[in-house]
Amino acid sequence: MRKTLVIVGAGFSGTVLAANLLRSSPAQGADIVLIERNGAMGRGVAYAERDFPYLLNVPAARLSADSRDPLQFLHYAQARLPNVNGEDFLPRALYGDYLQEILCSAEREAPANARLLRVFGEVTGILRAAGGRPLAAQLADRAPIAADIVILALGNPPAPLPAWADELRGHSAFRQDPRDLPKTLSAEHSVLIVGNGLTMADAVSALSRHADRIPTLHTLSRRGLIPKPQTTFHANAMRGSGEALLAHTHSLRKLLRECRTLAREVEKLGGDWREAVAFIRNLAPSLWRQLPEVERRRFERHLHVHWDIYRHRLPPQLMARIETLRRSGKLRIMAGRIQRVIARDQQLQVSWRPRGGDNAASLTVDLVVNAIGPNYAIERSVDPLFVSLREAGLVSADALNLGLRTGRFGACVDAQGCASRHLYYLGPMLRADHLDATAAAELRDHAERLASHLADARL
């Protein structure tokens, strides 16, 4: 019998999965239903068209969405832009164009027994069907769609609303969405960006677009650490099995020491520490799964933020912009915690405690931007779909609140600890089991493996 596979979300993960399923659909034929709530297939939040050209954080030569053609995106970009090379950091909207073309191309070349159905709408729940197909996707504005398989291809969840911002909802000087920035700021204004990661860098880039109207920028996070810069290096230069690292998964301290030794050895040989990070990244899922839970918790408390700044890096031109702003006094990067924010007419007064200090400091700004990053704790999610999934017991959070518990190929683990045969997850919340699952190459590989599994499995 012809099968129906429903993919919820048409950002990177959902689009690449749909393209792979079109190329390798189950033998009995399949309807692949791709559902997107934001109005544009292939873009999601990350690659949406915006009035500011946000850059990709990875060079063009390392962003192919098809492992069979490693330079596919580079060739796509070179056909559309002048003088593009593999080391360039290109606009994210162009990558969204590329993903849309991948989907259209896969649809054109699909075998006769595979069909893509595009649906625009919001999925509010996944239902256990009473008969016939095992699941159904419930939508806000139309009848449920019955499915043999449902794949939750959901991207990064939005940032949580911090406790100090609870009374700032709707205030003109507060932005919960870091890309929803006012265009009326001038050099006389001041802005506090809460968070020092990649989202902060995007906000700094957008707020400093006009050289004569750059507001005074402050950024604040608990440790005051910012991402390291990207550079050109040979990602595949290091070879080996990683046995020395895998031998120390019983102890985080020993594992960290071995990682540092590896980075020093690379640099002694004239290499770049980024090569060591790339090597460790490839081993990260195995290392993470073998660490005892007590060591995982220690990593979360003390080391995850350090891993992130080395692992998730900035385009060199964006880092240069940040350094220029710091030297000019237009940007101040701070470490500490916000204690309270009070509205004073059109401004906000921020009381915060510097890291390592005993006394609170005060800062009055014209705008506060929440850039603290995604909220992976699904137990606290207020998204209607996750609330429904949680209440139905179809999904469960991992012990560290890093994302979703999953089995092989991303099969969702339910509240009873059983891996589903019909419900899968593909996206950054795989980090619970893999530590990292946000880069395009990682999600591409997950998508290809899942598509191959679904094509071979007896649905």
Tell me what each language-model feature is:
Residues 1-39, 45, 82-458:
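Flavin (primarily FAD) cofactor-binding/catalytic cores of flavoenzymes
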Residues 36-81:
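Redox-cofactor-proximal catalytic regions of oxidoreductases
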